[in-house]
From Swiss-Prot:
Glycans are attached at N57. Residues 197-262 are annotated as: 4 X approximate repeats. Keywords: Calcium, Chaperone, Endoplasmic reticulum, Glycoprotein, Lectin, Metal-binding, Repeat, Signal, Zinc. Belongs to the calreticulin family. SUPFAM superfamilies: Concanavalin A-like lectins/glucanases (SSF49899), P-domain of calnexin/calreticulin (SSF63887). Residues 382-402 have a biased composition (Acidic residues). This is Calreticulin. PROSITE patterns: CALRETICULIN_1, CALRETICULIN_REPEAT, ER_TARGET. Pfam families: Calreticulin. The keyword Aminoacyl-tRNA synthetase does not apply. Residues 266-304 are annotated as: 3 X approximate repeats.
């Protein structure tokens, strides 16, 4: 049947458009670091007096999918970095909150990361640093071989609460998109490159509130509770004469030397060897305990100190975004930041930025690696002796550093990293 055109059709179309507009997400902040970005961001003077403040470069990096798609990149080794931007203050109460950004570690990062922070209240952007109070932190965290995870912290009542779940992060030298979503039902999700890597409950995965249930402190294990899983086998008896078996016996193959003189050398005795019959102290075999009741556990009761917070997910004041980090090796590049209440909108933003260029960036990286390998191969034998000397020097330096670290009790790089 044909659809009749007219006023009813027009009204339906308008209602459909109105419905789409009603569910469209709100963007609180968006940054692609295009021309004019410096007017929106404030570089902190944190650590400047100590000559430890690093400079940011506006660049697309050594390899990229689009030379015109630039971000901000750390440029100096062993430096602190801090920069922030302000946006209209809002609260995520009764709404979803999405924080998303892209990051690329061109330097093949082995220790570091980068705190991307949401802050509220009054912040002096010129002094923003490691001690500045914040509401939310999300970052990929890499610490040598031990830590390679997405580091997420929520601050409530002045206390910083680290997520209790380990979510692996990307560790290569390409751009990756990290998304942190908090919902009004107190659930959250962590996405990497638009793929959900972890989801769960804020109640369960952060120790923001006391536990709802606790072990009953008054409960006692019953005296007749049998928690021995195995018991000695009453049927197993020690063989007669077992304790008389010697641990060692004279070597039956040993012969008295022909030139042995009993008067001068003393009475000859054969050397001993382990006795193959000796089995060590006798131990009674164990069997399953037929009366085993399991490990006793105190029953759980309601925690009298627990007080629910229906707005555990919410932050009353979100007004700034900051990037703050310490870098042993510089080269980390941040780009394409968005703060919104619509996960679908954030996903589209990622696809239109990172997604559009990821294949070209991978090709550029592969080409750069191939060129580097060819250049290294071209040097050939001329550098082999030098390389060997360098390796020996590096090994000696590592040994010296290990000795120094053993004395200090802590690696100096880790001290810098831990300072953050």
């Amino acid at each position: 049947m044909a659809i009749r055109k007219g006023s009813s059709y027009a009204v339906a179309a308008l209602l459909a458009l109105a419905s789409v507009a009603a569910v469209a997400g709100e963007v609180f902040f968006q940054e692609k670091f295009e021309d004019g970005w410096e007017s929106r961001w404030v570089k902190s003077e944190w650590k400047k007096d100590e000559n430890m403040a690093g400079e940011w470069n506006h660049t697309s990096g050594k390899w990229n999918g689009d030379a015109e798609d630039k971000g901000i990149q750390t440029s100096e080794d062993y430096r602190f970095y801090a920069i922030s931007a302000e946006y209209p203050e809002f609260s995520n109460k009764d709404k979803t909150l999405v924080l998303q950004f892209s990051v690329k570690h061109e330097q093949k990062l082995d220790c570091g990361g980068g705190y991307v922070k949401l802050l509220g209240g009054d912040v002096d952007q010129k002094t923003l640093g490691g001690d500045t109070s914040y509401s939310i932190i999300s970052r990929p965290d890499i610490s040598r071989y031990s830590t390679k995870k997405v580091h997420t912290i929520l601050t409530k009542d002045g206390k910083n609460h680290l997520i209790k779940k380990d979510v692996p992060c990307q560790t290569d030298q390409l751009t990756h998109v990290y998304t942190f979503i908090i919902r009004p039902d107190a659930t959250y999700s962590i996405l990497i490159d638009n793929e959900e890597k972890h989801t769960g409950s804020i109640y369960e995965h952060w120790d923001i509130l006391p536990p709802k249930k606790i072990k009953d402190p008054e409960a006692k294990k019953p005296e007749d509770w049998d928690d021995k899983e195995y018991i000695p086998d009453p049927e197993d008896k020690k063989p007669e004469g077992y304790d008389d078996i010697p641990k060692e016996i004279p070597d039956p193959d040993a012969k008295k030397p022909e030139d042995w003189d009993d008067e001068e050398d003393g009475e000859w005795t054969a050397p001993t060897i382990p006795n193959p019959e000796y089995k060590g102290p006798w131990k009674q075999k164990k069997i399953k305990n037929p009366n085993y009741q399991g490990k006793w556990k105190a029953p759980m009761i309601d925690n009298p100190d627990f007080k629910d917070d229906p707005y555990i997910y919410a932050f009353d004041s979100l007004k700034y975004i900051g990037i703050e980090l310490w870098q042993v090796k510089s080269g980390t590049l941040f780009d394409n930041i968005i703060i919104t209440d619509d996960p679908a909108l954030a996903k589209t933003f990622a696809e239109e930025t990172w997604g559009k260029h990821k294949e070209a960036e991978k090709a550029a990286f592969d080409e750069a690696e191939k060129k580097k390998e060819e250049e290294d191969a071209a040097k050939g034998g001329d550098d082999e002796d030098d390389d060997l000397e360098d390796e020996e020097d590096d090994e000696k330096a590592d040994e010296d550093k290990a000795d120094s670290d053993a004395e200090d009790g802590k690696d100096s790089d880790d001290e810098k990293h831990d300072e953050l």
